[in-house]
Amino acid sequence: YPSNVLSTTGDLTDEVCANNSMTPIEFSAEGGNSISISVSPSIALFNENITLAAGTTTFTLNKNVPTNVTTTTVYTYTVTLTGNANCPAAGTITGTITVNPNHNITLISAIGTDSQTICYNTGLTSITYQVDQGASGFDFSWDNNLIPPGITHAVSGTTYTISGTATSDISVATNYSYTVTTTGIAIGNICATETVTGSITVLPRQAITLASASTTESQTICEQTSIATITYNLSKGATGATFSWDPAYDGTLGGITFGLNGSTYTISGTANANITSSKTYGYILTTNGNTCSSTTVTGTITVLPDDKITLNTANETQSVCESTPIDDVVYTLSEGATGYSFSWDNNSI
């Protein structure tokens, strides 16, 4: 009777990534025709009993390895040949398959931090990823090489953090998208890496700029005269503005109008104030628009009263004889008047 002999010229030590096939190994069998295959730790689909057909003396071991390994695991398999009970059992071969896990990356900061919207010059809620299983590092890139100034990214062990403050004084909302790809174990480039993406949208600040002459923002006029038109331009995140009179000053100035036309805000009109002393009216203009902080500008309009002179006696026109004193004619200065000049008409004194 021929002896039970099992042999192979294949490599009995293999290393693969999860969810892949082992390197096929061809075995030769002599004497017996019953093959049993087992593995430890047990893999259900790996265990098998094979009966070789008559005249067949070879078979190939080619199995898929587990998909759910999270750490590198060594599996020891045993191939046993039986069948010729009259001969010594000499048909056992063992080998090992080292299975490496595929890569895994997980967002460990709050849900939604990987895609967030922030305002100019405000801090980003830190975005943190962690790798495990077959991954040990990161490749990071900003898509289209569009990099947000002030935002940084760094590795610390198995975590990757994106943080910082958006410092680019942009004019329109700008989206910065990024890609993070794991690095680590790679057997013949077949260990599956994992990629995550995210985005940071930066909103521009609400901007308002004086467009009229610098002297118009705080000006002085006389009552019942027109102010020099004050004009502001809205830009970036500002789409509108709210006007109010500053209560810290002298109240509301009648006759002044204000309004928005496109992106231009205009303050104009005639100071309709009946005042007896100088008054200063302060105004506040506050932007609105996107969700970023509003911007406020202020100015003042100082209104001066007209000069006023009042006759206090009833004898501004009188007739007297020569060398006779006149009755006193008395005038009072008020409101804007602080002095006087006197002249005789036609130089007749």
Question: What are the language-model segments listed below?
Answer:
Residues 60-71, 161-172, 266-276:
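Extracellular/luminal low-complexity segments enriched in Ser/Thr/Pro
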Residues 21-28, 123-130, 226-233, 324-333:
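A short beta-strand segment in extracellular, disulfide-stabilized domains
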Residues 2-10, 102-112, 205-215, 306-314:
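Proline-enriched interdomain boundary motifs that mark the N-terminal boundary
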Residues 82-88, 183-191, 287-292:
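Short, solvent-exposed loop/turn segments at the edges of extracellular beta-sandwich modules
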Residues 40-59, 139-160, 242-265, 341-349:
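Low-complexity "stalk/linker" and mucin-like segments enriched in Ser/Thr/Pro/Ala/Gly
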Residues 1, 89-100, 190-203, 292-304:
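C-terminal edge beta-strand
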